[in-house]
Amino acid sequence: MKRAVVVFSGGQDSTTCLIQALQDYDDVHCITFDYGQRHRAEIEVAQELSQKLGAAAHKVLDVGLLNELATSSLTRDSIPVPDYDANAQGIPNTFVPGRNILFLTLASIYAYQVGAEAVITGVCETDFSGYPDCRDEFVKALNQAIVLGIARDIRFETPLMWLNKAETWALADYYQQLDTVRYHTLTCYNGIKGDGCGQCAACHLRANGLAQYQKDAATVMASLKQKVGLR
């Protein structure tokens, strides 16, 4: 039996990964992390979606220690989430240092426990917010370290790594789940479900990608299929 673990936040990217994983694997487990995030409404959304979409199991882990150690606008109410700024440079204050290091490590331990061959994460280096732990070189380096550290060939999969946001919308549509992703996921840094607040960087990337896809769906879908080998 092919089994995978999806690092699942209930947002657009991880939900799209879950939708695809359910087609590719016989048994799919979700793992969600509660680190006291500002947008922790995502945890309830993730639980609802994992059940709705048909995941075999869903584990929610308390990793409150991350909140104590990592200073970010997503872990401190006293730090405001900035509005989207096309001219912003550097790493934004929404970056949570060590988050993906911790999440992927714990997901790998869980994969070891349940006998999964893959850990799937929705990180992306094409349309992203500049987080260093979303880069392909980081994911590959950590994957190598995990394999060495647990002596188990657990594979990290990043199906969205080289897709832009329009192509990510196309992928959800390919599996006939675009409305599920649009109306039932939570991507917004301010914790607003669906189309979100419309002001933060996460909402901007999501809305811009949807607009691009809706403007020329056929071209975007063709690009997606060519990139990932879909028919």
Swiss-Prot record:
Its EC number is 6.3.4.20. Zn(2+) binds at C188, C197, C200, C203. Binds 1 zinc ion per subunit. The keyword Heme does not apply. CDD domains: QueC-like. Pfam families: QueC. HAMAP family: QueC. This is 7-cyano-7-deazaguanine synthase.
